[in-house]
Design a protein with these regions (language model features):
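Hydrophobic anchor at the beta1->P-loop junction of P-loop NTPases
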Residues: 3-5
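Walker A (P-loop) phosphate-binding loop of P-loop NTPases
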Residues: 10
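Conserved lysine of the Walker
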Residues: 13
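Hydrophobic positions on the alpha1 helix immediately C-terminal to the Walker A/P-loop
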Residues: 16
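NTP-dependent small-molecule kinase module
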Residues: 19-21, 137-181
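ATP-dependent small-molecule kinase phosphotransfer cores
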Residues: 29-121, 161
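Structural signal for short hydrophobic segments within the conserved structured cores
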Residues: 32, 65, 128, 147-149
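Conserved phosphate-donor/acceptor-positioning beta-strand/loop module used by diverse small-molecule
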Residues: 91-93, 114, 122-139
Length: 181
């Protein structure tokens, strides 16, 4: 099963990912934790370029191509092999961040972003995306693979809800969906 976490910085993604991984391991699952950009040696090198304050003049098209290169390596080297081995992969961010940051944030054409992302991932989408810290109204606009979690509660309450959602999806997962960002 491939699970991704999205949400603004400071929404508790890292904490919730760690707690979910601990719980899944206690349930007997093999879990791989990863992040984007990064997740592989090549991806981490690209992450360094993307996050270098010296590169503030980076063109938006250059940025999306670098993120996509990192993602392509991530999928090929880590995510697909882990899925094939029956592991649960939990990623701190994935392709949905591309629409938010490069699409809405940097003004790139959403259809172009979808096409580039589909090429980079070979169409691989998560079975479940957990999005922290959005309103219920925004959450209703998502697809059925999204689980909107109210992150304004205690860490324990948020984790309990995440566990409930993941438990319900285990065994019902759809690993390879058409790309609908």
């Amino acid at each position: 099963m491939f699970i991704t976490f999205e949400g603004p910085d400071g929404s508790g993604k890292t904490t919730q990912i760690r707690l979910l991984a601990e719980w899944l391991r206690e349930q007997g699952h093999e879990v791989v934790l990863t992040r984007e950009p990064g997740g592989t040696e090549i991806g981490d090198q690209i992450r360094t370029v993307l996050h270098d304050p010296y590169n503030t003049a980076m063109d938006a098209r250059t940025e999306i191509l670098l993120y996509s290169a990192s993602r392509a390596q991530h999928v090929a080297q880590l995510i697909r092999p882990s899925l094939a081995a029956g592991k649960i992969i939990i990623s701190d961010r994935y392709a949905d961040s591309t629409l938010a940051y490069q699409g809405y944030g940097r003004g790139l054409d959403l259809e172009v972003l979808r096409a580039v992302t589909s090429f980079a991932t070979g169409g691989l989408t998560p079975a479940l995306t957990v999005y922290l810290n959005i309103t219920p109204e925004e959450g209703k606009q998502g697809t059925e693979r999204w689980a909107v979690i109210d992150a304004a509660r205690s860490v324990e309450e948020v984790q309990a809800e995440i566990r409930t959602v993941v438990q319900a999806r285990l065994g019902k997962e759809t690993r390879f969906l058409s790309l609908r960002l």
